[in-house]
Regions:
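C-terminal catalytic subdomain
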Residues: 64-120, 126
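Carboxylate- and glycine-rich phosphate/diphosphate-binding segment that chelates Mg2+/Mn2+
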Residues: 1-61
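A ubiquitous short alpha-helical element
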Residues: 12-19, 90-92, 117-121, 141-143
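Alpha-helix N-cap/helix-start motif at coil-to-helix transitions, marked by capping-box chemistry
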Residues: 15-26, 60, 83, 98, ...
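Amphipathic alpha-helical interaction segments
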Residues: 19-23, 27, 47-50, 68-71, ...
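C-terminal charged capping/lid subdomain of soluble metabolic enzymes
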Residues: 108-164
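Amphipathic alpha-helical segments in well-ordered regions
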Residues: 4, 8, 31, 72, ...
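Short alpha-helical scaffolding segments that buttress acidic/His motifs in well-ordered protein cores
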Residues: 1-5, 48-55, 89, 125, ...
Length: 164
């Protein structure tokens, strides 16, 4: 999901990647909860396969600050990439979405939210993370708070930060 969201929000225009990102986001949003609840559900796993593949294609366009920060945290603290991304995603959405109202509306529509505003989209992501019992802070996965300035400085040098 993070791959699709970040790729879609990269400012460069790339209709093929944008289409892949939106369709990937839609599929992951639909099938991830089912796949988590029913790990042997072949339809859910297939939906996740296609959604993840589309999101992977989409990020040929670039990624953003979630990945820039996650790369640095993972390298220094050996955290799991997807989990680190999931924890960081809502905070970066709060930073990025005010600058991309049309992108927010498009993503919210793709996941069938009635309210297509920024806060509704972030609330939806947070609800999914809560459902999956994802920790709400990096300190809960062993990342100390005293590293914030160092990680931020390193993250701004990451190639993903350049396409945020």
């Amino acid at each position: 999901m993070t791959h699709a969201i970040e790729a879609y929000l990269v400012p460069d225009f790339h209709p093929l990647c944008d289409g892949a990102a939106i369709q990937g986001l839609s599929l992951v949003n639909k099938w991830l909860p089912v796949a988590v609840q029913e790990p042997k559900n072949i339809s859910a796993r297939g939906g996740m396969l296609v959604g993840s593949c589309l999101a992977g294609i989409a990020f040929l366009k670039g990624l953003g600050l979630v990945h820039a920060i996650s790369h640095m945290i993972g390298a220094e603290f050996d955290t799991q990439h997807g989990l680190t991304n999931a924890i960081i995603l809502p905070k970066i959405l709060e930073y990025n979405l005010p600058h991309t109202p049309e992108g927010t509306r498009t993503m919210a529509s793709a996941i069938h939210l009635k309210d297509t505003g920024q806060q509704s989209f972030i609330n939806h992501i947070n609800a999914l993370l809560d459902d999956f019992k994802i920790p709400t802070s990096l300190s809960k996965i062993g990342v100390p708070t005293d590293c914030v300035a160092r990680i931020a400085t390193k993250a701004m040098q990451d190639s993903a930060a350049k396409t945020n």
